[in-house]
């Protein structure tokens, strides 16, 4: 019996290893097929005259339909026929098919770019639809690259569209980038931004990078002109502009900070414009086109500001003569972007005793206000630490709003272990909470259950737990868990 169990275990292990190897081979095959599709792009076409007067065959640079389609932009002096031919021959890679990538891809496909590659491993969600203009309601749940390409093919069937249904990795990035002429960074996290920039520099690809959050956006054209590593006349890279990544806990996503669709759309359209300029312009003169950072602010006057960037840094880790980041370090994994950028973690993680589920909260406190209007003993106080704009969207009955930003901006007092002492409390605390006589429990809630933990720690540092006589804890999982466990009609935003 023991031998049979060992045999079964060995066979299971072999099957698992074989399946893993097969998955890797399938991924390699997909990349190879995509590369072959890119290289199969035709460069010349023979057109038959359609004037109804002759059957002669003539060599025209574009199809008759292309002249009609692109005529309005071809008569722009900065573009012309030669510019259109450059666009048709161009191979553009867009990393990220979201709020930036959708408008960028839309206008590049419309302009007649020959090959358009899209890299994204995410699927379409309802929360994407207000700003990611290539995706439609019927495509929720499908890969973003497939949803985008479906739309783009209806818009313009002439370009070759190449999907990459996975998130970009250091090992695969060089193999993908090498088949393209220019790269657009349309992502929203620092680790991927550094990876995209490093790969673009090492392979000599110009990079158009943009970002957007709330009502503001930024745009840069990097590694342009794309000179070899160590050549000071080349354009700066992302590391030249930002040698050190931002603190992991300071990075705010669109899901947490919010984003206006027209803002991210503006930045994506500007990315497409800059890509067209790079593709169609003659050889660039670095002194005539100094690198710059374009800043867009929707609620400021003027809307746009430009800051001139410095040249390549002499000690840059990727584009200087002493570069430590190489194609080899990418492929072997020794350049760890997640480690370099750090992982955002909770500043304060609470113990199980300091946390309570929404269901348990409702069991302990079935009524927040007694029916007779009187005040019951141990009446809970719910502090909602979301920002006011979110609190105004929806809030728990009788909860009070003290934004986490307000809590963190105040100086902490040492934990007060003396129940009879009067701690120095900040102005934003309601009088009933600041009262030394109150021992009613305090429950802190936020959107997902992260900020509430930090807030609980701060409140205890301020002495609100009365040396352990008063319960101060958070509602685990936040309002998302409240929706799942208590109120399925709670607004999900």
UniProtKB/Swiss-Prot annotation:
Described purpose of this protein according to its UniProt entry: Plays a central role in 2-thiolation of mcm(5)S(2)U at tRNA wobble positions of cytosolic tRNA(Lys), tRNA(Glu) and tRNA(Gln). Also essential during biosynthesis of the molybdenum cofactor. Acts by mediating the C-terminal thiocarboxylation of sulfur carriers urm1 and mocs2a. Its N-terminus first activates urm1 and mocs2a as acyl-adenylates (-COAMP), then the persulfide sulfur on the catalytic cysteine is transferred to urm1 and mocs2a to form thiocarboxylation (-COSH) of their C-terminus.
Listed EC numbers: 2.7.7.80, 2.8.1.11
Name of the protein in question: Adenylyltransferase and sulfurtransferase uba4
Gene3D superfamilies, per database record: NAD(P)-binding Rossmann-like Domain, Rhodanese-like domain
Encoding gene (name): uba4
Chain residues that bind Zn(2+): 237, 240, 316, 319
Keyword NAD in record: no
Segments crossing the lipid bilayer: none
Main localization of the protein described in the UniProt heading: cytoplasm
Entry's Gene Ontology cellular component terms: cytoplasm; cytosol
Annotated catalytic residues: 254 (glycyl thioester intermediate), 446 (cysteine persulfide intermediate)
Domain Rhodanese as annotated: residue spans: 376-491
Superkingdom of this protein's organism: Eukaryota
Keywords assigned: ATP-binding, Cytoplasm, Metal-binding, Molybdenum cofactor biosynthesis, Multifunctional enzyme, Nucleotide-binding, Nucleotidyltransferase, Transferase, tRNA processing, Ubl conjugation pathway, Zinc
Compartments, record wording: Cytoplasm, Cytosol
GO biological processes: cell budding; cellular response to oxidative stress; invasive growth in response to glucose limitation; Mo-molybdopterin cofactor biosynthetic process; protein urmylation; regulation of pseudohyphal growth; tRNA wobble position uridine thiolation
Pfam families in alphabetical order: Rhodanese, ThiF
Protein family according to the UniProt entry: In the N-terminal section; belongs to the HesA/MoeB/ThiF family. UBA4 subfamily.
Cofactor(s) in the UniProt record: Zn(2+)
């Amino acid at each position: 019996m023991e031998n049979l169990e060992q045999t079964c275990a060995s066979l299971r292990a072999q099957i698992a290893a074989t399946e893993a190897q097969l998955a890797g081979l399938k991924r390699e095959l997909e990349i190879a097929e995509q590369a072959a599709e890119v290289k199969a792009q035709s460069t010349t076409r023979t057109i038959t005259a359609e004037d109804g007067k002759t059957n002669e065959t003539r060599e025209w640079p574009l199809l008759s339909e292309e002249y009609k389609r692109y005529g309005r932009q071809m008569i722009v002096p900065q573009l012309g026929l030669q510019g259109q031919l450059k666009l048709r021959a161009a191979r553009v890679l867009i990393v990220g098919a979201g709020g930036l990538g959708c408008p960028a891809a839309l206008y590049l496909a419309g302009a007649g770019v020959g090959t358009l590659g899209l890299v994204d491993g995410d699927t379409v969600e309802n929360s994407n639809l207000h700003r990611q203009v290539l995706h439609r309601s019927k495509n929720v749940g499908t890969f973003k690259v497939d949803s985008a390409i479906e739309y783009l093919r209806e818009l313009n069937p002439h370009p070759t569209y190449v999907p990459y249904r996975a998130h970009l990795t250091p090992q695969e990035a060089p193999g993908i980038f090498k088949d393209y002429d220019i790269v657009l960074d349309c992502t929203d996290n620092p680790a991927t931004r550094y990876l995209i920039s490093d790969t673009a520099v090492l392979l000599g690809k110009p990079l158009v990078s943009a970002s957007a959050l709330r009502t503001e956006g930024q745009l840069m054209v990097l590694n342009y002109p794309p000179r070899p590593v160590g050549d000071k006349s080349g354009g700066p890279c992302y590391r030249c502009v930002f040698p050190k990544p931002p603190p992991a806990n300071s990075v705010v996503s669109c899901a947490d900070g919010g984003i206006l669709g027209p803002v991210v759309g503006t930045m994506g359209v500007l990315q497409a414009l800059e890509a067209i300029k790079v593709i169609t312009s003659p050889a660039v003169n670095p002194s005539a086109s100094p690198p710059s950072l374009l800043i867009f602010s929707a609620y400021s006057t003027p809307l746009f500001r430009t800051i001139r960037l410095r040249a390549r840094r002499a000690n840059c880790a990727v584009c200087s003569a002493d570069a430590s980041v190489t194609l080899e370090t990418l492929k072997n994994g020794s350049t760890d972007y997640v480690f370099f950028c750090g992982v955002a973690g909770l500043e304060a993680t609470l113990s199980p005793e300091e946390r309570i589920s929404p269901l348990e909260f409702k069991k302990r406190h079935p009524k927040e206000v007694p029916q007779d209007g009187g005040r019951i003993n141990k009446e809970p106080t719910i502090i909602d630490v979301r920002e006011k704009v979110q609190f105004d969207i929806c809030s728990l009955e009788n909860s009070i709003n003290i934004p986490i930003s307000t809590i963190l901006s105040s100086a902490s007092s040492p934990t007060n272990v003396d129940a009879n002492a009067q701690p120095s409390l900040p102005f934003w605390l309601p009088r009933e909470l600041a009262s030394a006589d109150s021992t009613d429990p305090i429950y802190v809630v936020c959107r997902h259950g992260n900020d509430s933990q930090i807030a609980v720690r701060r409140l205890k540092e301020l002495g609100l737990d009365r040396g352990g006589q008063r319960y101060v804890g958070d509602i685990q999982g936040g309002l998302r868990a409240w929706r799942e466990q208590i109120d399925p009609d709670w607004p999900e935003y």
